[in-house]
Amino acid sequence: MDIGVPREASDTRVAATPTTVAQLRKLGYHVFVETGAGLGASFDDDAYREVGGVIVDNAWNRDIVLAVGAPSDAQLLDMRPGATLISFLAPRQDPSLTRRIAAQGINALSMDMVPRTSRAQALDALSSLANISGYRAVVEAAHAFGRFFTGQVTAAGKVPPATVLVIGTGVAGLAAIGAANSLGAIVRATDVRPETAEQVTSMGATFLHVGQADQGVSSDGYAKEVGADYAARAAELYAAQAREVDIIITTAAIPGKPSPRLITAEMVKSMKA
């Protein structure tokens, strides 16, 4: 059976690394990697050849296609009827893509629909990406901040530690809390799910309570949209914190919907220069 790994049009990620290809080859699959597919992730074509991958101009016309982003209409047309596509497809946000995939007779596995359960943890690629996003947010913020995160005592005087507010304490938020705390910052965090307070405090951060959210968590463990009353009280908290903290990192997300916009321009203007 053939597996195709296409080059992503606007993403530096690749669906299979040379290590992954080597594992697939041991299982008996023939792996076809599109020219330059791994360059954005620092894997050249030779790295795939060395582990048994075949470099091709088009990897979409295979039995199984592993991709990161959703395919274009032209790429879908390249796929064989009865083939299987494994990718991040966001079916709740783009149901028309799901219909086009079904109309062409393609089997689809959307990696962003893997439930957040211990049994499915090994397949939870979305949480893996969220972990990286939270960590990177702190790294980017530290670079832009311009001074130490941790407090300093020097001959010229004392420098206070940075204060970081993390909104949303899912996988990305907890990763951001851990990274900021390890750099010596004072970390505060808040979430619509008050039950996450214990996780936050165990990581050395302070949990800021807004109030009991009305059904703030779904049955699969993800946050849900909150009511107007909670949103108003949360906005008051964000506005007050914006005047005190040095850095705000927002990781709040609702599956299947655009991420909520929680920080206004006025809040940003009120932050310390």
Predicted features by range, described:
Residues I55-V56, T84-F88, N107-M111, V187-A189, ...:
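Short hydrophobic/aromatic-enriched beta-strand-loop microsegments
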Residues D2, D73-T163:
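Glycine/serine-rich phosphate-binding loop and adjoining beta1-alpha1 elements at the start
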Residues E8-A9, T35-G38, A70-P71, A90-P91, ...:
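Short, ordered loop/turn segments at secondary-structure junctions
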Residues R7-F43, T150-Q241:
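Glycine-rich phosphate/diphosphate-binding loop of Rossmann-like nucleotide-binding domains
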Residues G52-N61, P71, S218-I248, A252-A265, ...:
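A structured beta-alpha segment of the ubiquitous adenosine-cofactor-binding alpha/beta core
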